[in-house]
Amino acid sequence: MKKNKYEIDMCNGTIMDKLISFSLPLMVSGILQLMFNAVDIIVVGRFSGSQALAAVGSTTALINVFINLFMGISLGANVLAARYYAAGRDREMSETVHTSIMLALISGVVMAFVGVFFAKGALELMDTPADVIDQSALYMRIYFMGMPFFMLYNYGAAILRAVGDTKRPLYFLIVSGVINAGLNMFLVIVFSLDVAGVAIATVVSQAISCVLVLRCLYKSEGSYQLRFSKLCLKKDYIIPIFQVGIPAGIQSTVINFSNVLLQSSVNSFGSIAMAGYTAANNVLGFLYTSVNSVTQACMSFTSQNYGVGKYKRMDKVLIDCLILSSGMALVMGGGAYLFGTEILQIYTGDPEVIRCGMEILSITTVPYFLCGIMDLFPGALRGMGCSAVPMILSVIGTVGTRIVWIFGIFPQHRSLYVLFISYPGSWIITIIMQVICYLIMRKKVYSRAAAVIKKRKKTKKPRKTAE
């Protein structure tokens, strides 16, 4: 299979250097996406005050609840495309691409409708304080108008990841990120649009990245070339995409629902604590992006090797991913803890907001490598096409632990520090369950593979010998 300069051969050669080549652009891309929100927060916090900062930050968990189901489906598209691409099944690859892009378009339109019409009601259910709820609702409504662009970009980038191309999505985000930062400063400082200004800047930047990734697919050669006339919804591809993607999306949605409960608990401390959580949560978002880039690599590498039957190599992929993810998280988490005060000062100059933010970072940053380990095992299983059981275990381990903590322990010991102990506690419990699940399901996958190989050997015709 001929590969262009952007693609990575995931099925041959050494693994670690290819994981780094795949993960590093993906991590930087994720950081740039976070920068869209970070620049929003920094500009609002510095030029519009802590109330506007709380208004923008209080929407994060709620926005994630709305979009993660549909974003999870993009993981299904990534897994299916990687499998067909590695196996050289060009027709199936092309139809996966066109079905995925159509799903993205429909998902984006649905999310735009939901966000615009139900934003304020959802914020009221979260007990968002009266002094920020109108600004929060305005930010959400404008933000959700850009959902079609957001979905199309992410589904398009998922297709490129499937073939090992993480560099071009990075280039697209650099362009859109610079435009986002410039528009933020212009609309907030010059026109004093506050939360509306940062939301408009985000939508415009998402539209630009969407156009760039679709243009890239349109101009590509081979099986993942996009032709708008071929957009379709084919049952044979929707079902396997949903089998992997919907459980992943449900998992993200339910976990973010637990974060909404967490946000509600933070809201009970007032707008200062909300602003501190907003800044601290943005820092944690950068840590998550680093470990999630390795999880994405694990899923794509596993899926391609699964597609060509290289099962032993899948074990090596997981081991190298565990080493890479843990190493990055320990370095970045340790740095975030040691320099937390200085980092939070970028977001706000209010000492009380910084104090609240540091209270959260002090318990969540150093053990963040556990979050990476927790995600890698279900990521490897999704690469094999197994998604439902890891989803159930993640929901039980992560959400169950946090709900018990929020309603059982936290009311007796009300502080931000105690509230956020639920993070590392839920990671440890979930890791134990996911490791057991992985070992059991890996054994089943290997047994099926051995049975197929044995059957092939039996059906081979013996060579005729000369009489």
Show where each model-derived region lies.
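Short alpha-helical transmembrane segments in multi-pass integral membrane proteins
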Residues: 1-23, 81-146, 188-246, 302-367, ...
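Transmembrane helical elements of multi-pass membrane transporters/channels
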Residues: 21-40, 142, 176, 205-209, ...
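Hydrophobic transmembrane alpha-helices of multi-pass small-molecule transporters
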Residues: 65-68, 180-185, 210-214, 286-289, ...
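Helix-terminus/linker motif at the lipid-water interface of multi-pass membrane proteins
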Residues: 35-54, 123-130, 186-195, 253-286, ...
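Hydrophobic alpha-helical transmembrane segments in multi-pass membrane proteins
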Residues: 22, 26-34, 71, 103-112, ...
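Small-residue-rich hydrophobic transmembrane alpha-helices
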Residues: 53-113, 150-169, 276-334, 338-340, ...
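Residue-level signal for short hydrophobic patches within transmembrane helices
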Residues: 12, 16-35, 39, 62-69, ...
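Short runs within selected transmembrane alpha-helices of multi-pass transporters and secretion channels
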Residues: 74, 143-161, 169-177, 198-213, ...
